[in-house]
Amino acid sequence: QAALFGWLPVMLWILIGGVFFGAVQDFASMYASVKNPDGTNLFPQNYDAAKWKTAADAAYKIIDGNLYQLYHSDDDDPYDNYYGITQEKWNSELIWTTGSKGRFIMSAHTCPTSVAGSSSWGFVGVTQQQVDAYPMAKTGRFPITGYESDGSPIVDQESGYPMDEMAYTDFVYPAWGGAASYKLNTVKMCTERDPRFYVTVFFSGSKWHHGNEMTLTSFAHGANGYTSDARPKSGFLVNRFYDHTANSANGQWGEITFPTFRLGEIYLNFIEAVLECKIRGVNIPANYYTKAMEVWQELRAR
């Protein structure tokens, strides 16, 4: 506990210097008039680029302390490396959690109605924009760079993303979370994506893994809650926070130590702050940029 609370001021400086406060000029009209009860402004009234260095310093202090390590699964599998962050309780990456809690609420809301049991509600989904944000596995490039006025995607031609994204194709769904790989026929949009996509996003036509069972699920043509509220409007559910090793059909939901702050986030905060300093001409220690690129490679390799 002493080690944990010793780092709390550092986390606050990251927030103060980072996007939410350091870049408050982007939301000036929204926040400028927000005040404390004593009349003092709650948010900065003027932009200060030097706060990016404050954020970089705070993040570097955590990184340099070597108290935490990025989580890796026993076999260093890229899918389980990501899934394990929320699956393995009290793992080496967690800095501050909400403690060990039951997963029922978050899991019941994301478990599709195709799964047996009275608590498979399946209506908390992922937006299409979030789906589009995941890079391609082979190139590492982000496929969708924006949208036309009619909502159609602007595709990075070098990403490897299929132009016929809604055409169906055979695909081998990857093995992760204790479940074996399997073949399915799905839209090309959902194929050959970054491992984080499959751990996070559940899409129609794939199988929901729960305990020793794999349940085929579709959100189209009246299947699995299409005519009720118990379905995701976007056609995608959230995979990640459900314990796929537990049998929720029998009321087993598992527990989670929810990662309020984890080392991966600190790495990203540090990288962002260092790059903002570089762009805005803010002086930082000579080793910061090298360290930022080093931890970026660690994240990508993981």
Predicted regions and their residues:
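N-terminal low-complexity segments that are often proline-rich with Ser/Thr-Pro
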Residues: 2-12, 16
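C-terminal substrate/ligand-recognition segments
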Residues: 177-299
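Hydrophobic core segments within long, regular secondary-structure runs in both alpha-
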Residues: 1, 21, 49-63, 289, ...
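Well-ordered alpha-helical scaffold segments within catalytic/enzyme domains
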Residues: 3, 22-30, 269-279
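TPR repeat positional signature
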Residues: 13-24, 260, 267, 274
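Surface-exposed helix-capping loop/turn segments at secondary-structure junctions
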Residues: 6, 66-74, 275-282
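An aromatic- and glycine-enriched ligand-binding surface/loop that stacks and positions planar moieties
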Residues: 24-221
